[in-house]
């Protein structure tokens, strides 16, 4: 389809070498012929009837044909010696535009003519109006359209929507929750606090959560008055800390008196052997805890300022009212003969 314009200049010519009217002196009915001999014939065709005036182009002395934007293009054909289908090339130049459009339409074959010329009557001209026209842009226009970038439609978004779309990406945890210092403590901090607590209990001699009861046929025993969790500090096995040589001398003295019990506990600390002697009577409860192979407590070393202390911790959860027991670890024959309860 051609764009609607107010006035279009149309130039028509025959595809020959000269581009002139082949009849020269004879009357020519071509609308585009501007020869003086052909002008009367062109004017006679204009006076044929009103039915052809609406679609009839106007001839000018310059060889151009003027037609309005709503009328069809009338093609004027001439027969060549080869009698093949020729194409009529119409050069359309729009007003105020530099890029020309070339339109071609196939030339139908005619079976009759006069002296090699084929003329179109009004009926044929009306039929020719229905023939399609093929528009071809110039080469410069085609190449420029290939390199032309497609235009993008710019859509303005409101600043409020843009802010809302960007806000989720810029959100921080502190926007939802206030900043506060974590109350969780590391494992090393917990161990340090536990050690400080045990140091305080040992240094001050605090022994809570237990009491002494008398057991018939067995003697005194220590019972829990509160539950203890596994690994929790229970009590210190308090006594005199001795080197191995001093401990052996005291043990020989205690052996001379059969009524004296044995409350000496040997252990190693930093590749040295030590002994805690709790034989001397005192109000400390750790020395009164009885022996059992399946006890609920176990011994453990605890150093304060480089000095080892022997303490008892719960080997399992201890309920309130249970007797506190631990394994003495002495399996010698002499000890078992002197104290048969060490077997159990």
Curated annotation (Swiss-Prot):
It is found in: Nucleus; Chromosome. SMART domains: SET (SM00317). Its EC number is 2.1.1.-, 2.1.1.361. One of its GO terms (biological process) is dorsal/ventral pattern formation. GO terms for cellular component: nucleus; polytene chromosome. PROSITE patterns: SAM_MT43_PR_SET (PS51571), SET (PS50280). GO terms for molecular function: histone H4K20 methyltransferase activity; histone H4K20 monomethyltransferase activity; histone methyltransferase activity. Its main location: nucleus. InterPro entries: KMT5A, KMT5A-like, KMT5A-like_SET, SET_dom, SET_dom_sf. Transmembrane segments: none annotated. Disulfide bonds: none annotated. Pfam families: SET (PF00856). The keyword Phosphoprotein does not apply. Residues 143-176 are annotated as: Disordered. S-adenosyl-L-methionine binds at residues 218-220, 263, 290-291. It catalyses: L-lysyl(20)-[histone H4] + S-adenosyl-L-methionine = N(6)-methyl-L-lysyl(20)-[histone H4] + S-adenosyl-L-homocysteine + H(+); L-lysyl-[protein] + S-adenosyl-L-methionine = N(6)-methyl-L-lysyl-[protein] + S-adenosyl-L-homocysteine + H(+). Residues 208-329 form the SET domain. The keyword Cell division applies. Keywords: Cell cycle, Cell division, Chromatin regulator, Chromosome, Methyltransferase, Mitosis, Nucleus, Repressor, S-adenosyl-L-methionine, Transcription, Transcription regulation, Transferase. Signal peptide: none annotated. Protein-lysine N-methyltransferase that monomethylates both histones and non-histone proteins. Specifically monomethylates 'Lys-20' of histone H4 (H4K20me1). H4K20me1 is enriched during mitosis and represents a specific tag for epigenetic transcriptional repression. Mainly functions in euchromatin regions, thereby playing a central role in the silencing of euchromatic genes. Required for cell proliferation, probably by contributing to the maintenance of proper higher-order structure of DNA during mitosis. Involved in chromosome condensation and proper cytokinesis. PANTHER family: N-LYSINE METHYLTRANSFERASE KMT5A. Belongs to the class V-like SAM-binding methyltransferase superfamily. Histone-lysine methyltransferase family. PR/SET subfamily. This is N-lysine methyltransferase KMT5A-A. It comes from Danio rerio (Zebrafish).
């Amino acid at each position: 389809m051609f764009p609607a314009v107010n006035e279009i200049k149309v130039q028509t010519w025959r595809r020959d070498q000269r581009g002139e009217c082949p009849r020269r002196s004879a009357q020519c009915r071509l609308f585009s012929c501007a020869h003086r001999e052909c002008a009367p014939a062109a004017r006679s065709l204009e006076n044929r009837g009103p039915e052809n005036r609406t679609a009839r182009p106007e001839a000018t002395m310059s060889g151009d044909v003027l037609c309005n934007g709503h009328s069809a293009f009338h093609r004027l054909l001439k027969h060549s010696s080869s009698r093949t289908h020729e194409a009529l090339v119409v050069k359309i130049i729009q007003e105020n535009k530099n890029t020309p459009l070339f339109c071609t339409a196939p030339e139908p074959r005619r079976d009759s003519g006069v002296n090699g010329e084929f003329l179109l009557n009004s009926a044929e001209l009306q039929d020719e109006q229905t023939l399609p026209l093929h528009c071809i842009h110039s080469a410069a226009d085609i190449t420029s359209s290939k390199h032309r970038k497609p235009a993008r439609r710019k859509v303005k978004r409101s600043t409020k929507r843009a802010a809302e779309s960007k806000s989720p990406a810029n959100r921080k945890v502190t926007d939802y929750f206030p900043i506060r210092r974590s109350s969780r403590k590391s494992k090393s901090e917990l161990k340090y606090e536990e050690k400080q607590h045990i140091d305080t209990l040992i240094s001050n001699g605090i022994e809570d959560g237990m009491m002494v009861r008398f057991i018939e046929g067995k003697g005194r025993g220590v019972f829990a008055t509160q539950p203890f969790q596994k690994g929790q500090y229970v009590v210190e096995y308090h006594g005199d800390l001795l080197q191995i040589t001093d401990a052996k001398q005291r043990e020989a003295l205690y052996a001379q008196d059969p009524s004296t019990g044995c409350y000496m506990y040997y252990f190693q600390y930093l590749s040295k052997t030590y002994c805690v002697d709790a034989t001397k009577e005192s109000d400390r409860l750790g020395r009164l805890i009885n022996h059992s192979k399946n006890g609920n407590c176990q011994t453990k070393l605890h150093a304060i300022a480089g000095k080892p202390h022997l303490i008892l911790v719960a080997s399992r959860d201890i309920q309130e009212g249970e007797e506190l027991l631990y394994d003495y670890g002495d399996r010698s024959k002499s000890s078992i003969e002197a104290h048969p309860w060490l077997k159990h």
